Amino acid sequence: MVKIYTMISTNFLSNKSKFFQPQKNRGSVTWRCSSNIELIKYWGKYEELLPFNPSLSLTLTNAYTETKIDYTISDKSSVEYFIDGIYNTEMTQLITEFIKKLNSNFSFLSVLKLVIHSQNSFPQFPGTIISSSEVGSLALCLCSIEEELTGQKAESEFFFRKASFIARLGSGCAARSIYGGSVLWGTLPKINKSSELYGIQLGPLPFLEDLNVATMIVSSSTKPDPPLIRYIKLQLYNVASCRYEHATMHILRLLDIIKRKDYFAFCGLVESEALLLHRMVLSSSVYGVFFHPETLNIISKVRSFRKKSGIPCCFTIDAAPNIHILYPNQFREIVINFIRDTLLPNCESQQWLDDKVGIGPVIIDKNFNYCDDQIILQDNF
């Protein structure tokens, strides 16, 4: 039987009395957390990174961040951030500001010296300050430090709920990287545990968990013009209520498609959802597009390949020229050959990332049972 919890933000406040008798003065924790790709897109926020609409994503396997935090109780708090072993001033400032916002959630932060080492398994493109996997791994480390200092081990469900809540405060999409498989963030009818405060894992959903994901790197350097970004943010705010209804409808349709195991309906819905934002941009009076000519070439070739081969291979795309190709694992060899022979000439230096849907974050060098709190989809979907 699935337990039902109603959680509000005060559930994640720190119990200060526990920390004043710390169980240790120093320690180290390491988490590996993967990035996610959206099938139903997150279109904006209100208040403290609460989403205008529910979104649904797939957590990857090979595109991950591994973060280690060495912590020491000190008279004065401080943060040092290293990426690939190199001290990073910009990230140190960014994470220091983020940490300051979390004092009500982790009372111990005001007396800790934190040395953070982060390493990405995937390229960090210009224009991306911090990835969802970086924020997710950082949030998981902080929750583990809380357990070590208080000597109180939280129930698995609460631990990951809080980690997702904390990750959301750093980057909205990071709330979904705390779980594996398919993840929902935002309130959705018929899903009692769904929340704007954190993500929840949906499953088991073999239909989605079997998918391979290939990311075609069309450009590693393009950053949208500020006027275009300002226009998009304004438009997203203006259509927020409409977008909530539309995204909700798309997620419910997607869940029905999964139940029916209709791969081609899945392709149609995912591609339609992916292009909604770009249609709005193309119809705007502000000059600018996210697409490159190579982006359109890949879209055309994927659709042509699907039609000719009968293989349910589709794409999704974010606010960037790069494209994610999704396909069932049983067609892996055929699709990989198609990518190498047909799509790679459209990629920058023929770069692409080969990935698949993953199990979610793991703690490194410690015995830890990953969260098995899955939301079981009922027959009424």
Model-derived regions: residue spans:
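C-terminal nucleotide
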Residues: V2-E48, L58, N62, T72, ...
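Alpha-helix termini
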Residues: N103-L109, E146-A154, S304-P312, T342-C347
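Short glycine-rich or small-residue beta-strand-to-loop segments that form or flank ligand, phosphate
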Residues: F82, H117-G127, A320-P328
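Gly/Ser-rich oxyanion-binding loop with an adjacent helix/lid
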Residues: I8-K16, Q23, F108-L208
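Helix-rich "cap/lid" substructures immediately adjacent to catalytic or cofactor-binding pockets
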Residues: E90-P123, L142, E294-I298
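Short, conserved micro-motifs enriched in small and acidic residues
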Residues: S57, T89, Q93, T128-G136, ...
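Glycine-rich, flexible beta-strand/loop modules in the N-terminal catalytic cores of phosphate-handling
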Residues: L56-S110
